[in-house]
Structure formats: C-alpha cells, structure tokens
Swiss-Prot record:
Function: This protein is involved in the repair of mismatches in DNA. It is possible that it carries out the mismatch recognition step. This protein has a weak ATPase activity.
A Gene Ontology biological process term: mismatch repair
PANTHER family for the chain: DNA MISMATCH REPAIR PROTEIN MSH1, MITOCHONDRIAL, DNA MISMATCH REPAIR PROTEIN MUTS FAMILY MEMBER
SMART domains: MUTSac, MUTSd
The protein's name: DNA mismatch repair protein MutS
GO CC annotations on file: cytosol
Keyword terms: ATP-binding, DNA damage, DNA repair, DNA-binding, Nucleotide-binding
Gene Ontology molecular function, alphabetical: ATP binding; ATP-dependent DNA damage sensor activity; damaged DNA binding; mismatched DNA binding
Assigned protein family: Belongs to the DNA mismatch repair MutS family.
Length: 851
C-alpha cells in the first residue's frame, strides 16, 4: 500500500482503516461509498463492480471502487453472505460547512452474526455465538441482534460446543480463548464459520444476572462487549440474559436432526419435505421462529408438554374461533424485528405504521382468546398487554400514507401538531395569497399586465414593463432593472414570501423532529413490546399445531412412566404428507417393559428406515407438545435421541462412511441413558463383512447390557437375529414380503420375527440392472449359499470363529489367504465384551496392518 504524496482525505481513510484491518471499509464520499487499495480490488471481484483508480496519472495510482449510497445495502449483504465484515464510515458533518477534510467516523461494523438491516429480510433467527473456556468447562452464549434474544449455558466438552453451534446455525463465533489447531479446523474448514475474538468483558447488571458460573459470565460478557463495539450505540431492545440447560430439552445432535429432516430436507437443503414444513401453519414471522425453536428443542417436562397439548385441544374443539384467530394473526407484523429497528434508530414511518397496525389487532386477538373460555388459554390472555396508549400515539401521529423514508415529508398526520399544521397551511394557501395580491395590485394600479413571478435570486416580484413604469405605486420598491422591464416588491409580498419560505424550510425540519420524538417514545415501550411478541408467537404456534392436527387427523399422545412404547397404526408424518394418506402404509410399534432392542431385518427399499424415522418423529412431535400421526400413542419421556441413519462420507473432514458410523455410534453409547432412544441403520456396512458384523454384534450387546436405551437396530446381517436367543431384552422384527411366482412384493409392514431372505437381487431388478448381470448374480448367490455355512453368534468374549470360517464365509469369491500365527494369537486375545466400538475399530485397524 503505497503512501507517498497521500492527500488529507486519503490519510483520513488510512487512519480509519488501520482500526478495522479485518473488514471492508465503506468510506462515504458524497453520494457514494468508496473502497480503496486492497479492499477495492477484492470488492470489485466479489461484487462485480468496476475497478478504477484515484490519481490515475500518479506514479502509484490508488485502486478505487464504489457503490451508490442508496443501494449500498445489497452490496453489503453480498459481502456478509460470503463471510466478510463491513465497516461503514459516514460523513459526520455537512461537506458545504466543513473546514478542511470532512469529518468521518465508522458508525457500525456489520458482521455475519450481527446483521440487522438486510435488504432481503429473513424470518429465521441469525445467532451470534460466543464461546469461552475455563480449562474445565465451556461457556456458550448466543444472541440474535435483530430480535434481542440473549441466552447462555455451559457445556462439558468441545463436541457439545460444536453440536450446539450447528444446532443454532450460527455463521459467526466469537472466541475468548485460543483454540487448538484441530478445533480451529473444525470450526473454519468444516463448519465454514467466521471466527472473531474478544478479550474484554462487558458488565451490565440489567441484562446479566450474577447467578451464573464464571465461564458463563465471561462468555456472555464478551459477546455483549463485541455487540456494543460493532454496533456503536445503546441497544435498548436487548433482552435480559436467559440461562438454559441442555438437559432441560430432548437432546439431539446436529447430525441426528439432519438425518431426520427436522428443519430442512437433508437432500435439498430446503424447508419443503421437513418436519418444519409440515407443521408450519403459522401466520407471523415470530411464530415461524418459535416453531422452529420448538422443533429444535422438544421438552422433557411432562407438565409443560401437557400444558401445550391442552391449549391445542381447546383450539381443535373450536373451529370458528380458531379460524378467526388465524385471520387476526395475519395482521401481526414482526414486533421483535420492528423493536430492534427502533432501538437501532433505523425505524422509518412504514415500520411504525406496521407496529401500530399490529397493536390495533391485539384487542381482537385478546377477545377471540377470551371466547374460548378455557383456563389454560386464559393464562395467555392475562399476560397480553395491548399497549393502547402506544397504538393511539402511532395512529394519531403517523400519516397512513407516509413514505418509507424520513426525508420526503408527509410523515405526520394533519392535526397532530399546531405549528406543523400552520406551516402546511401557509404552503398550501400561499399560492392563493399571492394570486390575491396580484389581482388587488393590478386593479389598484391600473397596470393591466401586472403579474407576480419568481426566481431563486429575486424571490417573488412584480413584473412591470417600461411602458407602465409611470403607473407604479409608491409602496412598490425596486428589486431589479432589466432592459425592457423592472422588478418590484412590496412589504406585503415580502411578508407572504417570508412566510412561505419559512414554512417550506421549517416544516421539513419540524416534521423530522416530531418523528424522532415519536420514535424515542416508542423506544420506551420496547420491553413491553417484546413480551407481547412472545405471547403472540406462542399463540401462533399453538394454533398452527391445531390446524395441522385437524387437517391430518392427528391424535393426542399419552405419556407413561414405565418405559413402554405403544404406537398403533403410526405414520411417518412427513412421508405421509408427501405421498398422500391413501398411499401410505401405517405401522404399529411396540416395546414392552422387558424389551429394549428391536433388531429389524429386511430388504432395501422395504421401509426399515422409514419405520425408524417414524418412531423418532413421533417422539419429537409428542415432546414438543404437538399431536401425532397415529391411531393411538403412549410413550415414555425420552431424554435424548441418537441416530445413525443413511450412509455418507464426510468429504470436508476427510472421514469415511465407516469412521463417521463409528464416531456416531461412540457418541450414542457414551451419552445415552436408559431413557434415551437409539436408532442405528445398517451399522457396520462401511467395512468388510465380518468386521462389520463383529462390531454390530458388540455394539448391540453393549447397549443391551450396559446402556439399556430403547433401540431399533436395522441390519443386513441375518446372522445377528440369533442374538434373540441370548439377549433377553432383544426381539426380532422384519419387513413383510409377499413372494408369488418368482415376483416379490414389499408390503412395507413390520412383522414379528427375523426376515428369511434378503431380496437384494430383486431390488437390483427393480433398479433396472441388465438381465444378464442379474442372472450371473443369481448363480454367484447360489454358489455362496452352497459353500458357506451359517455363522455362529459369539456369546463368550474368548470364543472367536476360526480363520477358515472367515475365509469360507466371506472370502470364497476372491481366493483363500493364509493367516499368520501372529494374527491368530491377536484375534484370540480380543476381549469383545469389554471393548467399546471405537476400541474395536482401532484394534481391527491394527490387525489389518499385520496382513
């Protein structure tokens, strides 16, 4: 960056830029925001704008790019979306009145985690996350600057931190400590996060309660410091810090939520095809955000769940009132975001009109809720604050046709302010007054062509031609002399002109001041507005769940304390919605007190994964308070759901399918309790057959003997079905098929007992593989079934199948391979029953190196 012969203006730019080295600096110059040096070069590429230079003829011209100030937001949005920060430097004085260089200051730093003014507003939350570490536990705080939501918790390990960041869908993470290289790689490379750093703790007793752990206080304080440092203003909309515990909600990792398509479809990354899509009949942006939060964090408190259920039931029983409620909610704007715009000093007349329109709807909503005549609904009604005085202020002050900007005028209603009304009257009637003066003076003077004209130099004046100069009255005074005429003024005309000019100037200034005063008054109501927003959002979500329950014929689930699962004719709610009720085949699911594991066998495409997901979605919907897709449901309360459904390599982190399988299995068996739900689909398929089968068996036994969680384990390893004779809490189920005249029909129904065939070749036939290939596969299958003998399920840790059995059962297609005595000894020494899956994986890896 060459600095020779730098002008005062460019020196000012460089002085500001050095304080914001990690941000694009938008430097206001007149009607443009300019970027210089490296910022200009990079921005020109990213924003596809022209790159020019300042001082083109100089030895070292300065690269320059710019965007118009009125459209700058769309360019800022692009940079933020790409993960960059933007510092905005404004002119702090009128350039016409400036002495020397115009004073400029950065007024805001916009980052991916602090977006408020996007040109494409999104109803979803945008959380900024802060993490600190005290050497033992992690403090994690998060905030949505656009709504003021502010929460904190503490977590035991980095895996939990990573999962919570993913669940929050954060784009920026603020760190108060040094990460390891591996942790930094995870956050930056794998999760594509912008990392920012903050060391100073901001103390605000009005927001942060002291009854927190030290690491929670530092995480929350550093987050607050960063927000104040970037936004550079008082933020009255920030809500008091809320402490939460992960254990107070149904725990699910980001991978689990993704595999279950909770908030977006994992294949399309779109809302359509997700549980969120299915349940979203909300009418407000606040309701949409809250619904997503409920799906993300189902409850574990039976009392809280039943409270939600009760209100949904009341709404279900009153169709007309619920319809009126839904229609009224359509008139409710995003109170949380509008409040934040007021707090940021960015609310325009349209924003206040939306707020006023919303408040005008509240009495109707309150009356409808009262008409339900229900004690559980009355709890919501009693907390509704209609803010009638604020609604009256906005209604009487802001013109309903006011523009979106505060510089165009016509903002304030007539009748609200006497001075403003007077100025408007002067501007409105001034032209008439001038016409009256013109007519009066023409008649009095006898100058028939006397007229009043206007220009910027002379203002209003009487135009008198030379031929009529002798008729000019004495009270006229000369303002200008032209070749063929004279320009005159009068005291009366000057007075009217002064009034009109004053009215024009003062009206604009006064209207601006009045609007600012009104906005300041609105700001004093922010806390009450935020409380109202929460209640309306809750009402919106509950009516949405009632609408969905009625539309799809859902039932109210029950809960028990005896670890029994009973689902009669259950459906996968999302699949049913996509397929249609007529095509979907329901399935019942039953776990009695003695059953902890269902081992499910059956061919691909037969419905095993759907059956497992059906159970998970039923649990999630039930524990978020929703009604569910079944004829009858009775469930225990689960504390966590762990899944491994669907196989895919983690390409970004370089982890194979098998490694991902083992890591997720490890998380499940380490963290699950006997109140958890585990769903494993084809675990072990990512490695060689016998490796996979050995691990699958070991994991099943470990869960059975040590964890006790309710588990569905889907497998292609039919040999594992023999475990039911050795594990008392395991039962076999399978997907029923109908075989007739060589054709196989998958019934998509779960039946008791193990499957007798795999039907893999039939699936290949459905997929359209060539007939010759299928015929060859049949021949190979027949040969394998003839050669191999049934595999013995290992019931004692030291009992390991001989290498000849392994060769005969797995490797006959590829030829025998002699095993060394060393490998045989190593295999015999393995204590399978006392190994974790991760240890088993490591041992297998070491054994393979001996080959």
């Amino acid at each position: 960056m060459a600095k020779t012969n730098i002008s005062p203006g460019m020196q000012q730019y460089l002085d500001i830029k050095k304080d914001y080295p990690d941000a694009f600096l938008l430097f206001r110059m007149g009607d443009f925001y300019e970027l210089f040096y490296e910022d200009a070069v990079k921005a020109a590429q990213l924003l596809e704008i022209g790159l020019t230079s300042r001082n083109k003829n100089a030895e070292n011209p300065i690269p320059m790019a710019g965007v118009p100030h009125h459209s700058a937001q769309q360019y800022i949005d692009v940079l933020i979306e790409l993960g960059y920060k933007v510092a905005v430097a404004e002119q702090m004085e009128d350039p016409k009145q400036a002495v020397g260089v115009v004073k400029r200051e950065v007024v805001q730093v916009i980052t991916p985690g602090t977006v408020v003014d996007s040109a494409k507003p999104d109803s979803a939350n945008n959380f900024l996350v802060a993490v600190d570490f005290d050497g033992c536990r992690y403090g994690l705080a998060y905030m949505d600057v656009s709504t003021g939501e502010f929460c904190v918790t503490d977590l035991a390990d980095f895996t939990s931190v990573r999962s919570e960041i993913q669940n929050l869908k954060a784009k920026e993470v603020l760190l108060g400590f040094d990460l390891s290289e591996e942790e930094q790689t995870i956050l930056v490379k794998q999760m594509n996060l912008l990392l920012s750093y903050e060391e100073t703790v901001y103390e605000d007793k009005s927001l942060i309660d002291g009854q927190l752990t030290t690491v929670e206080l530092t995480a929350a304080g550093k987050l607050l410091q960063y927000v104040h440092k970037t936004q550079m203003r008082e933020l009255s909309h920030l809500q008091a810090l809320v402490h939460y515990e992960i254990k107070d909600y149904l725990q699910m990792s980001y991978a689990t939520k993704s595999s279950l398509d909770l908030v977006e479809n994992a294949r399309t990354n779109k809302k359509h095809g997700s549980l969120y899509w299915l349940l979203d009949e909300t009418k407000t942006a606040m309701g949409m955000r809250l619904l997503r939060s409920w799906i993300d964090r189902p409850l574990v408190s039976k009392e809280a769940i039943l409270e939600r259920q009760e209100i949904i039931q009341v709404f279900l029983n009153a169709f007309i009132e619920r319809t009126d409620l839904s229609n009224s909610l359509k008139g409710v704007y995003d109170i949380e975001r509008l409040s934040s715009r007021v707090s940021f000093g960015k609310a325009n007349p349209k924003d206040l009109l939306q707020l006023g329109h919303t408040l005008a709807q509240v009495p109707y909503i309150k009356a409808i809720l009262e008409s339900f005549d229900s004690p559980c609904v009355d709890k919501l009604v009693n907390d509704i604050d209609s803010l009638p005085e604020l609604e009256y202020l906005i209604r009487t002050a802001i013109d309903p046709d006011a523009p979106a900007t505060i510089s165009e005028g016509s903002i304030i209603r007539n009748g609200f302010d006497e001075r403003l009304d007077h100025y408007r009257k002067v501007m409105r009637e001034g032209t008439g007054w001038i016409a009256d003066i013109e007519a009066k003076e023409r008649q009095a003077s006898g100058i028939n062509n006397l007229k009043i004209d206007y220009n910027k130099k002379d203002g209003y004046y009487f135009h008198v031609t030379n031929s009529n100069l002798s008729l000019v009255p004495e009270h006229f005074f000369r303002k200008a002399t032209l070749k063929n005429s004279e320009r005159y003024g009068t005291a009366e005309l000057a007075k009217i002109e002064g009034q009109m000019l004053e009215a024009r100037e003062e009206s604009s200034s006064l209207e601006y001041d009045i609007f600012m005063c009104i906005r300041a008054q609105v700001e004093t109501y922010i806390n009450r507005l935020q409380k109202l927003a929460k209640i309306l959002a809750t009402v919106d979500v509950l009516q949405s769940l009632a609408v969905v329950a009625e539309t799809n014929h859902y039932i109210r689930p029950q809960f028990n304390d005896n670890h029994v699962i009973t689902i009669q004719e259950g459906r996968h709610a999302v699949v049913e919605k996509v397929m249609g009720v007529q095509e979907y085949i329901p399935n019942s699911i039953s776990f009695d007190q003695q059953t902890s594991i269902q081992l499910i066998t059956g061919p691909n495409m037969s419905g095993k994964s759907t059956y497992m997901r059906q159970l998970a979605l039923t649990v999630i919907m039930a524990q978020m308070g929703s009604f569910v897709a079944a004829d009858h449901v009775d469930l225990p309360l689960f504390d966590a759901i762990f899944t491994r459904i669907g196989a895919a390599d983690d390409l970004i982190s370089g982890q194979s399918t098998f490694m991902v399988e083992m890591m997720e299995a490890n998380q499940a068996i380490k963290r699950a309790s006997d109140n958890s739900l585990i769903l494993f689909d084809e675990l072990g398929r990512g490695t060689a057959t016998y490796d996979g089968m050995a691990l699958a068996q070991a994991i099943i036994e470990y869960i059975h003997d040590r964890v006790g969680a309710k588990t569905i384990f889907a497998t292609h390893y039919h040999e594992l079905t023999d475990l039911s004779t050795k594990l008392t809490s395991l039962v076999n189920v399978h997907v029923a098929t109908l075989e007739k005249d060589g054709d196989v029909t998958f019934l998509h129904k779960i039946a008791e007992g193990p499957a007798d065939k795999s039907y893999g070749i039939h699936v290949a036939k459905i997929a359209g593989l060539p007939k010759s290939l299928l015929k060859r596969a049949d021949e190979v299958l027949t040969r394998l079934e003839t050669q191999s003998r049934s595999t013995e399920i290992i019931s004692v840790p030291s009992q390991v199948e001989s290498s000849s059995a392994v060769r005969q059962g797995q490797l006959s297609l590829f030829g025998d391979e002699e095993k060394t005595h060393e490998i045989r000894q190593a295999l015999e020494a393995i204590d399978v029953m006392n190994m974790t899956p991760l240890q088993a994986m490591t041992t297998l890896y070491e054994l393979k190196k001996l080959l």
